[in-house]
């Protein structure tokens, strides 16, 4: 739900959604966080950055004017998602209901196994 709102916001900003829109394999602590609360950890592709993350090539592209414009748009999109959830009772209820369903599936209200 949050991901769909993010995708819509990026499209409104004219950012195409190329590549995978599904689950990406990465190593972050967001998986731990989202077992307890709803969360959003979007990824953006930096045009021209063909190298792997955390390399000099990637840093060069990320630090370019184009990279900064992308991060500005990503921040705006994130703000739009937060605003939508904060000001729209229906969106907020749907997200919290889904989070409760997932927590229950994990074994309890906080995701802890009994």
Predicted feature locations:
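A domain-level signal for the structural core that forms small-molecule/cofactor-binding pockets
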Residues: 101-109, 114
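Active-site-adjacent substrate-binding region
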Residues: 1-48
């Amino acid at each position: 739900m949050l991901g769909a709102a993010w995708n819509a916001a990026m499209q409104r900003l004219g950012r195409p959604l190329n590549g995978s829109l599904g689950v990406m394999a990465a190593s972050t602590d967001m998986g731990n966080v989202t077992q307890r609360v709803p969360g959003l950890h979007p990824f953006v592709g930096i045009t021209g950055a063909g190298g792997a993350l955390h390399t000099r090539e990637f840093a060069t592209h990320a630090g370019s004017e184009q990279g900064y414009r992308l991060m500005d748009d990503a921040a705006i999109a994130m703000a739009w998602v937060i605003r939508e959830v904060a000001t729209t009772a229906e969106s907020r209820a749907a997200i919290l209901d889904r989070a409760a369903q997932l927590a229950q599936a994990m074994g309890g209200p906080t995701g802890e196994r009994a």
